[in-house]
Amino acid sequence: MDVENDRPPRRGAAGERNSGTMIYPALPATEVLVVAECWRAEAGAEAIIHRAVETAAGMVDTDTGDAELAIMLTDDAGIRTLNANWRGIDKPTNVLSFPALQPTGAPSPDDAPRMLGDIAIAYETLRREACDEHKPFDHHLSHLTIHGFLHLIGYDHETDEEAGEMENLERKILARLGIPDPYAPQERMA
């Protein structure tokens, strides 16, 4: 970890030293939109989100350097509406991801950013889960951000194999951030 820049080094050949300087990946442009007043109580939320996305982007095999994503910080009412409209589930949830559909065969300008998609995170559900699971708020926010980001780049947990792969990657990214395994039994995390 480069303490000065607080960014992870690139993986593989890109992480090699060049004239004594570590080469860093181009990171996705991340816009954080606060749409629910309850998030104003968490002054550091945007910095936590940016750090989580940057760390995840530096540890995955997908090139996200020319990409953009948006993260909407909403409340339970807002995410409940999204969940009902898009998934047919009329209740709040902690995080939703909406991967952008990339048109196949459609040319785009070389300098046009690639849209990864959108993530929505619900404040009350996140806060409640963190409290119930005895996790610091910032750790749980980092985890949900990483989870949503991985969905945008194609990871899923529909099967046990997919879930295992996604959870293992989440653990590695969180460990890089100094955050304990969120899937460990609670008594081990206390």
UniProtKB/Swiss-Prot annotation:
Protein location: Cytoplasm
UniProt GO molecular function: metalloendopeptidase activity; RNA endonuclease activity; zinc ion binding
Major location category of this protein: cytoplasm
Residues that coordinate or bind Zn(2+): 147, 151, 157
Any Pfam family: YbeY
Gene3D superfamilies recorded: Metalloproteases ('zincins'), catalytic domain (3.40.390.30)
InterPro entries according to UniProt: MetalPrtase_cat_dom_sf_prd (IPR023091), YbeY (IPR002036), YbeY_CS (IPR020549)
Keyword Ribonucleoprotein: no
Cellular component per GO, a single term: cytoplasm
Alphabetical UniProt keywords: Cytoplasm, Endonuclease, Hydrolase, Metal-binding, Nuclease, Ribosome biogenesis, rRNA processing, Zinc
Claim: Hydrolase is one of the keywords in the record: yes
Essential cofactor(s): Zn(2+)
Region listing for Disordered, in residue ranges: 1-20
PANTHER family in alphabetical order: ENDORIBONUCLEASE YBEY, CHLOROPLASTIC
The family this protein is said to belong to: Belongs to the endoribonuclease YbeY family.
Record-given protein name: Endoribonuclease YbeY
Classification of source organism: Bacteria, Pseudomonadati, Pseudomonadota, Alphaproteobacteria, Hyphomicrobiales
